[in-house]
């Protein structure tokens, strides 16, 4: 009974909009906005206008364990009327800024849907320039089913990208913190410098990379002096 009640609550926005002829309703959400390494991933998703038992545990992806998210992602794709995931690179975030990258990415994710939505729901962000009306819902990834589905797609896809990236850059521990600004991560940047996948426009990355560069420069000076002395 509790599961049925929750499914109905999550569908409230979509059902109300569809009844007013504004469907299909797409949800949009992002993952990685607060990270300092790797891309920001943005997903859009349209779900059928009916309860889906397979998605009964659907909620804000941050509240779900990694195994549950991994299990849910293929189910969301299976049941979705349409879905898309796009990625904005760290280089583009540095070039255009995180806010512009986020909004631009949300527009691109909606445009990439194979079915054109009649209405778009977002998790708190207003998206100008959409071809249809939209509504930002604070905490939407926990209260609107289509946003929760987009949240799972964005976060799980990005987590997989960061796990793969950890193979290329093992010195940063990316598989654990997924590019967020943990102490372990920032200490690694101070030791090794920032990688091409870091967001150099972020103050903490710039500071840690500068500390690495200064320490690296001091070491080179010391080594040069040692060689000259040995000569």
Curated annotation (Swiss-Prot):
InterPro entries: RNase_HII, RNase_HII/HIII, RNase_HII/HIII_dom, RNaseH-like_sf, RNaseH_sf
Reaction equation(s) it catalyzes: Endonucleolytic cleavage to 5'-phosphomonoester
Keyword Metal-binding part of the UniProt annotation: yes
GO BP term (any one): mismatch repair
Localization: Cytoplasm
One Pfam family linked to the record: RNase_HII
Iron in keyword set: no
Residues binding a divalent metal cation, per UniProt: 29-30, 123
Any Gene Ontology CC annotation: cytoplasm
Location of the RNase H type-2 domain: 23-214
GO molecular function annotations of the record: manganese ion binding; RNA binding; RNA-DNA hybrid ribonuclease activity
Chain ranges passing through the membrane: none
UniProt cross-references to NCBIfam families, sorted A to Z: PRK00015.1-3, PRK00015.2-2
Family: Belongs to the RNase HII family.
Record's function text: Endonuclease that specifically degrades the RNA of RNA-DNA hybrids.
Protein's recorded name: Ribonuclease HII
Organism: Corynebacterium efficiens (strain DSM 44549 / YS-314 / AJ 12310 / JCM 11189 / NBRC 100395)
């Amino acid at each position: 009974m509790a599961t049925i009640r929750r499914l109905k609550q999550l569908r409230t926005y979509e059902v109300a909009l569809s009844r007013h002829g504004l469907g299909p309703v797409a949800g949009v959400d992002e993952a990685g906005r607060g990270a300092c390494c790797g891309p920001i991933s943005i997903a859009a998703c349209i779900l059928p206008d009916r309860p889906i038992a397979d998605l009964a545990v659907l909620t804000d992806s941050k509240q779900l364990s990694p195994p549950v998210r991994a299990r849910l992602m293929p189910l969301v794709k299976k049941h979705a009327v349409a879905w898309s995931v796009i990625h904005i690179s760290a280089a583009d975030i540095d070039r255009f800024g995180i806010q512009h990258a986020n909004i631009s990415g949300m527009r691109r994710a909606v445009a990439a849907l194979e079915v054109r939505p009649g209405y778009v729901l977002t998790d708190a962000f207003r998206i100008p320039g959409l071809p249809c009306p939209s509504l930002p819902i604070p905490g939407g990834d926990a209260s609107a089913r289509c946003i929760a589905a987009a949240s799972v797609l964005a976060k799980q896809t990005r987590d997989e990208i960061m796990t793969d990236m950890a193979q290329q850059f093992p010195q940063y521990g990316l598989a654990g913190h997924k590019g967020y600004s943990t102490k372990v991560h920032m200490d690694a940047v101070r030791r090794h410098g920032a990688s091409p996948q870091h967001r150099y426009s972020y103050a903490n990355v710039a500071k840690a990379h500068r500390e690495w560069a200064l320490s690296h420069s001091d070491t080179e000076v010391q080594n040069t002096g040692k060689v000259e002395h040995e000569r």
